[in-house]
Amino acid sequence: MYNDLEKILLSKDEICERVKELGKTITCDYKGKTPIAICILKGSTPFFADLIRTIDLKLECDFIAVSSYGNKTRSSGEVKMIKDLDNSIEGKDVIVVEDIIDSGHTLSYLKKLLLSRKPASLRICTLLETECRREVPLNPDYVGFKIDDYFVVGYGLDYAEKYRNLPEIGILKSSVYSNK
């Protein structure tokens, strides 16, 4: 798998340290509350699992799955619901946990959908953000790392369902996906 990477962008240690910092900030921001953290499947799973263990609060968890990529490297802009939440978020403080925001289509769709369900508040926490590819206005509340326009894999991020299990985040060689 590592042969398919141009280079490691973020090491396991860098990710771990930043996740701890995000958890401390979220703990302070929600002191005295019981927020519900929503994991966007599948890519956010490792980040979500590590993040919630750093949040020192009573915390509820739920999961949602949407997609705008399929096996492509760029968002199609069309978002498809795959799995909805199991529980109501009405009147609850919601933290949406995402792996990466680039075009913003997926999160914009989700934000509108979730706000229509009348939560007390809704904030977005993303591990990675690439502002240069943003096609819709969207400002996450918590950002792990801002990165340039790379096709990244690892730590939950995939290409065609592969590379999610890498403990680091790496830049995928264009030769791996350019002829697909």
Model-identified regions with their sequence ranges:
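PRPP-associated nucleotide enzymes
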Residues: 1-180
